[in-house]
C-alpha cells in the first residue's frame, strides 16, 4: 500500500512536538488573527514564535502547514499585509486558505509557497477541484460531506492534484463549518467563522409551540432536553484502506484546541494503524477503533464517508466531550528510579495505569508516591508534582503519558 501523510493539529509548540514524535508526518498550525481557532491565552502560536514552530517541525523531519483560512474583512486584510513578511520568513511548507482576498495576498507576497485550499470552500465535486488546480493550488482539502466513492471519482477525473480528507475529530452541524448560529445567538460577539464559535449545536433544546409560550415539550425522553443539532465525532480508522485506495494523499485529524494527551494518543493510534495496513492490507482495524475510545469524544460516526448521514450520527443526549479513559499524568523528569510527573487527575498508591510513549504502550502499577520533599503519601491530587515508582517503567520517559486502563461503555459508532 502506498504511503500517505498523517496530518495532526498543533495548537502550540509542545503539542506540535508530541504530535510528530507520536507519529505525524505533518502538522497544521495557525495564529489567532488569521485562522479559525480562538486559542486560550498561553496556548497559542504567535507571529513571534511561528518561525520557531515551523523550524521545530522541520528539525523533527515533518512538514508544517500554516493555516490562514479566516474569512477576512477589510481590517483583517490590512493586518495580514502588515504581518506577511513574518509569515513568509517562517517558511511554511504550505498555507491553508479559503478567502479569495487572502489567497490573492499569499500569491502576491509568497508566490513560492504551495496553496492548500481549505475545507471551508466546501469542495464537493471534480469540477471544483479542477478549478483550484488550474488556479494554482497544489492540494484541496475536501469537504467532510463527501462519501469515499465520491472522492474516488474526483481522483479518477483529476489525478494531478493532492487530495486531503478528514478522518477524525469533532464535526460542525453546518456544511464544513460555515455556520451562523453562534453569531446569531450571541448578538455578533462570537463568530464561528472567526474561530470563536460558542457551539450552540451542543446546547440543550426543548420544543415550544408559538401559542403556548410557557409550555416546553421534550423532543426526546431525556430530562436534559435533546441535543438535536449535535453531531458525533468522526472516526474513520476502520476505513483507512478505502480512503487510500480512493486516492487520498493526506489524512487529517481535527483538534488544534484539544489536549496534549488527545493529540498524542490519536496520532499514535493512527500511526500504528497505517503502519500495520502497509504490512497487511487485510489487517483488522477494529482494535484501533477501541483504542480511540480512550480519548475524548461525543460518540463516533463515519459521517458521510459511507453515504448519506443518518440520525444515528447525532448525539441526542451527549453535549459535552466524554472520554473512555482519563488522562492521569505526564512525565517531566527522573531521579534515580523515581519519575517526576505532573498529575492531571487524582491517582492512588497501587493504582494500575496505562503508560504510552512514542514507542511503547503497557500497563503497570504505582508502587510509591512521594512529594517533592521526599515524603511518602497515599495519593496525588490534580496539578500536584510528585515522584512515582512503578512496577514497570518506560524505557524512555521523555514524552511519556499515563491514563486509566479500560474503556467506558457509553461510546458508540454510527
Regions found by a protein language model. Give the residues of each.
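Surface-exposed amphipathic alpha-helical tracts and adjacent flexible/coil segments at the periphery
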Residues: 1-22, 26-38, 53-54, 60-70, ...
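Aromatic- and glycine-enriched glycan-recognition loops and surfaces
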Residues: 41-51
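N-terminal active-site wall of soluble small-molecule enzyme domains
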Residues: 62-131
Amino acid at each position: 500500500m502506498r504511503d500517505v501523510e498523517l496530518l495532526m493539529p498543533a495548537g502550540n509548540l509542545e503539542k506540535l512536538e508530541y504530535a510528530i514524535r507520536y507519529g505525524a508526518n505533518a502538522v497544521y498550525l495557525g495564529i489567532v488573527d488569521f485562522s479559525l481557532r480562538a486559542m486560550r491565552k498561553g496556548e497559542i502560536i504567535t507571529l513571534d514564535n511561528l518561525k520557531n514552530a515551523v523550524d521545530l517541525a522541520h528539525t523533527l523531519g515533518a512538514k508544517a502547514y500554516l493555516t490562514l483560512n479566516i474569512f477576512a474583512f477589510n481590517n483583517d486584510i490590512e493586518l495580514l499585509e502588515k504581518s506577511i513578511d513574518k509569515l513568509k520568513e517562517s517558511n511554511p511548507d504550505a498555507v491553508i486558505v479559503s478567502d479569495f482576498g487572502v489567497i490573492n495576498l499569499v500569491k502576491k507576497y509568497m508566490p513560492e509557497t504551495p496553496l492548500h485550499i481549505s475545507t471551508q470552500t466546501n469542495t464537493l465535486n471534480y469540477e471544483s477541484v479542477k478549478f483550484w488546480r488550474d488556479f494554482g493550488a497544489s492540494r484541496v482539502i475536501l469537504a467532510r460531506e463527501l462519501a469515499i466513492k465520491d472522492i474516488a471519482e474526483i481522483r479518477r477525473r483529476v489525478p494531478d492534484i493532492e487530495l486531503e480528507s478528514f478522518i477524525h475529530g469533532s464535526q460542525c452541524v453546518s456544511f464544513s463549518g460555515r455556520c451562523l448560529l453562534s453569531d446569531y445567538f450571541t448578538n455578533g460577539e462570537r463568530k464561528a467563522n472567526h474561530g470563536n464559535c460558542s457551539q450552540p449545536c451542543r446546547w440543550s433544546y426543548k420544543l415550544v409551540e408559538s401559542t403556548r409560550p410557557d409550555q416546553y415539550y421534550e423532543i426526546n425522553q431525556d430530562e436534559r432536553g435533546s441535543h438535536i443539532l449535535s453531531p458525533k465525532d468522526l472516526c474513520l480508522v476502520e476505513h483507512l484502506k478505502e480512503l487510500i485506495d480512493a486516492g487520498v494523499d493526506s489524512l487529517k485529524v481535527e483538534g488544534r484546541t484539544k489536549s496534549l494527551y488527545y493529540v498524542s494518543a490519536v496520532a499514535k493510534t493512527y500511526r500504528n494503524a497505517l503502519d500495520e495496513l502497509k504490512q497487511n492490507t487485510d489487517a483488522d482495524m477494529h482494535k484501533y477503533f477501541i483504542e480511540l475510545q480512550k480519548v475524548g469524544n461525543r460518540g463516533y460516526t463515519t459521517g458521510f464517508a459511507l453515504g448519506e448521514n443518518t440520525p444515528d450520527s447525532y448525539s441526542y443526549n451527549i453535549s459535552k466531550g466524554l472520554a473512555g479513559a482519563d488522562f492521569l499524568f505526564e512525565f517531566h523528569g527522573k531521579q534515580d528510579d523515581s519519575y517526576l510527573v505532573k498529575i492531571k487527575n487524582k491517582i492512588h498508591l497501587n493504582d494500575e495505569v496505562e503508560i504510552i510513549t512514542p514507542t511503547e504502550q503497557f500497563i503497570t502499577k504505582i508502587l510509591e508516591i512521594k512529594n517533592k520533599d521526599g515524603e511518602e503519601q497515599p495519593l496525588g491530587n490534580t496539578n500536584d508534582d510528585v515522584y512515582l515508582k512503578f512496577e514497570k517503567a518506560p524505557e524512555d520517559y521523555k514524552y511519556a503519558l499515563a491514563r486509566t486502563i479500560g474503556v467506558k461503555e457509553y461510546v458508540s459508532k454510527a
